[in-house]
Amino acid sequence: MLIVLTGIDGSGKTTAAEATVAAARQAGKSALLLRNYAGRRRMSLLSARLGIQAPPRLADFLETAVRTFNVLNAHRRARNFHGLVVMDRHLHCQLALRGMHGLPRGRFLPWLIRILPRPDLVIYLDVDPREAHARILARGTDSERLEDLESLRDAYQSLPEFPRFTRLTAGGPPGDVLSRMHAAIEKAGGPRPDECSHASPH
């Protein structure tokens, strides 16, 4: 089963992905976590250190190249894996970032989404931008403006693909979010990651 997690920065994508895979492995199941980052955090830190800001189109070009490479490599690894595969981010995230910056969707990323194996479940972790902003400030590894998070949330919900996403409330304690995720996976036809398996791992 292939699951993709999306959502604004601070929505808890990485935390939920890591916890889901850990729960599945603890229950005796085969599970694989794949990260489809675009290098935004590193580029932001580098820009801040150098005191320069890359134009949105240049930043998008670099991010798209990095994310596309990671997504293609992730699908290559997922193809031969038997078990639960959780992808932390996907190409939809780049399309939402383009929307946030007022850039066109283009043709390449939507085409790539269509030809790649379709995930069994694309989960959108929905959180109030103010709570997401507080989480980002608390972790202290990067920074985001509240207005950008609000704009990104709007951009996600404006994606043509969004109606096919499973929207989960991501506010509150991580344990509650994880329970909602496991229930969504079960509803989509997969076994709950936290239920023990008597089968041998692949």
Per-segment meaning from a language model:
Residues 130-202:
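NTP-dependent small-molecule kinase module
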Residues 5:
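Hydrophobic anchor at the beta1->P-loop junction of P-loop NTPases
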Residues 8:
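P-loop (Walker A) phosphate-binding loop of NTP-binding proteins
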Residues 22-33:
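Post-Walker A helix-loop "phosphate-sensing" segment adjacent to the P-loop in P-loop NTPases
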Residues 13:
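Conserved lysine of the Walker
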Residues 32-103, 107:
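ATP-dependent small-molecule kinase phosphotransfer cores
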